[in-house]
Amino acid sequence: MNRREFSTSFLLGLSAVAISANAVAQASRGSAGAASKLPTVKARNIVLVHGLFADGSSWSEVIPRLQAKGLNVTSVQNPLTTLPEAVDACRRVLDRQDGPTVLVGHSFSGMIVTEAGVHPNVSALVYVAARAPDAGEDYTALAKKYPTPPASKGVVFDGDEGRLTEEAFVRDFAGDLPRERALALYAVQEPFKKALLTGKTTNAAWRQKPSFYAVSTEDRTIDPDLERFMAKRMNAQTIELRSSHVSLISHPVEITDLILRAAG
């Protein structure tokens, strides 16, 4: 092979490699965003944590789908009192797991996942339209860099307890659910204590564990661009769903698939 033939062959080879790499990258972005650099460990335990304006039953569409795959599933009843107490409730459940465990959080409970996710049993983290602060970060200050979501105006307090109004819950929290379903969820929402919102994480488990994120593009409770920022910062494998804040209820198949991916 002469020099000209070698150069042509070499350049064609590079071009083929570049095209192949680009195709893989596009497929990855289309299905799961930027892949985490950390390897995924096979897990048989799933621990789910609910956020504000909800209780453990908010995972009821996802739980049977995970159980059908033979996974051991526990939904934590988040006390919604203070961040340390909420984290302790989660840790007690994690202590009971018998091996690698995927820790999943929705909404506010991303704070809990971020803090408790350093537990040795936790093999991967999944954030569902969830907060994902860095260690010691003021999440409120971070959120103020983005437009104020409409649901914020619907928070009302009875003394120390906060909840969403019916209008805000149906329109801004669970906007893509049938009205009857949204009203049933509104009826069982757990009130939260003001002190819960003042807590800061001391850990950032997503810096140590493989992380996955489901962005809700129609979210009116957490700004979707803030969700994208947090997902990108943690180098999470990311999906985007045309969903309200409660994608775990309106898109349970996609959320289940993301958790299964995290479980290896």
Task: Name these PLM-found stretches.
Residues M1, S20-K42:
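C-terminal segment of N-terminal export signals and the immediately downstream linker at the start
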Residues E5-Q26:
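N-terminal export signals
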Residues A43-L83:
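Conserved HGGG/HGGXW glycine-rich cap/lid loop of the alpha/beta-hydrolase fold
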Residues Q67, N72-V102, A116-H119, Y139-K144:
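Active-site loop/oxyanion-hole signature of alpha/beta-hydrolase fold enzymes
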Residues G105, S109, V113:
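Gly/Ala-rich beta-loop-alpha elbow adjacent to hydrolase catalytic centers
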Residues V122, V126-G159, K193:
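Flexible "cap/lid" loop of the alpha/beta hydrolase fold
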Residues K193-M234, I239-S243, L248:
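Conserved serine/cysteine hydrolase catalytic core
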Residues I249-R261:
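Post-His helix in hydrolase/transferase enzymes
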